[in-house]
Amino acid sequence: MPLQSLTRAYQPTKFKHLISVLLVVVLSSTSCAQKKRPIKGETEFQRELNASYKDASTSPLKKKDLKNFDGLDFFKFDSTYVVTANFKRTPNEKPFKMKTTTDRLPEYVKYGELTFDLKGETFTLNIYQNQGLIKTEGYENYLFLPFLDETNGLESYGGGRYIDVRIPESDMMVIDFNSAYNPYCAYNDKYSCPIVPRMNYLKTRVEAGVKFFGKH
């Protein structure tokens, strides 16, 4: 209830009681403000991801990890890992069942191929579309880019990482590896996560995005 409404609710004879009530409200608000810590993150992506993981209603973290969660570990933002890729659509591909960490087999289709240069080398990654997700409003243009690299099992999660992108209007696509995130399985084994196809292995170190969370 707004403080102005509280003031109107009490009669003059109860003025002292009102002051006490308002004092409690103010002190409580001050206490909460002091306890609330700012969301960590060098970029907007990092701050949004940390905020999502800090929120019990959206976080994949186990209760014991959420209790002391202060933010994910990220590689330092590096513009080297923001690349422009040639986007080749593959409209004749047939849907397939993608393997996951459980017996769940979601239906995907290879939507295209992305070819780009990174640190003086040329790489190609397949990009996919979830055939169930495109039926959800707001995700009609959603594409899924899973990848493996040589930091996996060291600084980053052993099962690889994911990047979310939208279908571009042109035949070019910007890939920001700084926005690479871990599958939920990296935090909690109760989740079912797509296994990164082996053909999406990058034989280089991608020192960008979310790092390994810890032992689970």
Task: Show the residue positions of the predicted features.
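Extracellular/lumen-exposed scaffold segments
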Residues: 64-67, 74, 94-110, 172, ...
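Mid-length scaffold segments of soluble, non-membrane domains
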Residues: 94-158
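Acidic, glycine-rich flexible loop segments
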Residues: 144-181
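Bacterial Sec-dependent N-terminal signal peptides
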Residues: 1-38
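Extended, aromatic/histidine-rich regions of cofactor-dependent oxidoreductases associated
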Residues: 36-39, 181-216
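Start-of-domain marker
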Residues: 35-93
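A mature extracytoplasmic/lumenal domain signature
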Residues: 87, 127-131, 149-151, 177-181, ...
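Terminal leader/tail segments of proteins
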Residues: 79-81, 93-99, 168, 216
